[in-house]
């Protein structure tokens, strides 16, 4: 699910045949063929070491990432680059060092999809935090709470460079409050009781904790032009096309707020 950014032969052959035959052409790919020929993304090997002080505060993080690039690399090393600049997550990590190897193998090629390296990095970091909690005898939520970047430290510079060449800077956020709210809504403190009750009924349930920060807003960037038509209606022109995420509604609301006019008098053209 989710491969993108690639052109496959069938995407060219099917419409070409349809035009040549002047009739609909349908191509059906079975699951085995899909697994053998479609790009994938997740295959990485992580070796992570972490240093902490006596209070459970992170002192440093280091390790090695081996990224399976597949038989060839149509998208460069974007995915492992994102992975290594994501693994620190929302935590204060004073010292950081990772070596990354992108290896050619005999597997299908790797391209960015559905997280583009972030899920692997987050999994590696959060499993590390769980192991640390068990080793030190500290609650899993507490060890994370002690290391989350506080809101007063925002904007927070991670000291890393993202794949687009820009520094990794967390512009805002209240990570401690976010985790506290999640734990409260998930009734985390009451979970041992619920787990014991479920076990008595022959059911096995567990609970996990994970924090993540995702880099977004990559360039190039889009602007907007606002014009007032002779009819008095406002026309906002932008290259930000609607994708099912209410872009047009959001733009109309922002425009209406700034111009102090109802959004039904605003036309969005993209």
Q: What are the functions of these language-model segments?
A:
Residues 1-270:
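Structural alpha/beta core scaffold segments of enzyme domains
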């Amino acid at each position: 699910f989710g491969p993108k950014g690639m052109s496959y032969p069938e995407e060219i052959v099917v419409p070409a045949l349809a035009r040549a035959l002047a009739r609909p052409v349908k191509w059906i790919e079975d699951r085995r063929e899909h697994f053998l020929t479609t790009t994938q993304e997740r295959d990485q090997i992580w070796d992570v070491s972490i240093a902490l002080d006596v209070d459970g505060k992170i002192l440093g993080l280091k390790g090695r990432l081996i990224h399976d690039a597949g038989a060839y690399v149509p998208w460069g090393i974007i995915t492992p680059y994102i992975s290594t600049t994501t693994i620190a997550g929302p935590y204060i990590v004073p010292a950081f060092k990772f070596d990354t190897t992108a290896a050619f193998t005999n597997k299908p090629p790797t391209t960015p999809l559905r997280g583009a390296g972030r899920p692997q990095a987050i999994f590696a970091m959060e499993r590390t935090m769980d192991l640390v909690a068990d080793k030190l005898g500290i609650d899993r939520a507490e060890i994370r709470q002690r290391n989350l970047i506080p809101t007063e430290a925002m904007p927070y510079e991670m000291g890393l460079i993202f794949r687009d060449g820009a520094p990794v800077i967390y512009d805002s956020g209240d990570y401690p409050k976010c985790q506290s709210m999640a734990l409260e809504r998930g009734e985390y403190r009451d979970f041992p009781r619920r787990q014991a009750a479920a076990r008595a009924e022959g059911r096995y349930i567990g609970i996990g904790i994970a924090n993540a920060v995702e880099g977004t807003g990559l360039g190039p960037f889009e602007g907007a032009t606002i014009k007032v038509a002779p009819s008095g209606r406002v026309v906002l022109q932008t290259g930000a096309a609607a994708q099912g995420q209410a872009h047009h509604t959001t733009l109309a609301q922002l425009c209406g707020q700034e111009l102090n006019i109802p959004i039904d008098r605003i036309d969005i053209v993209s």
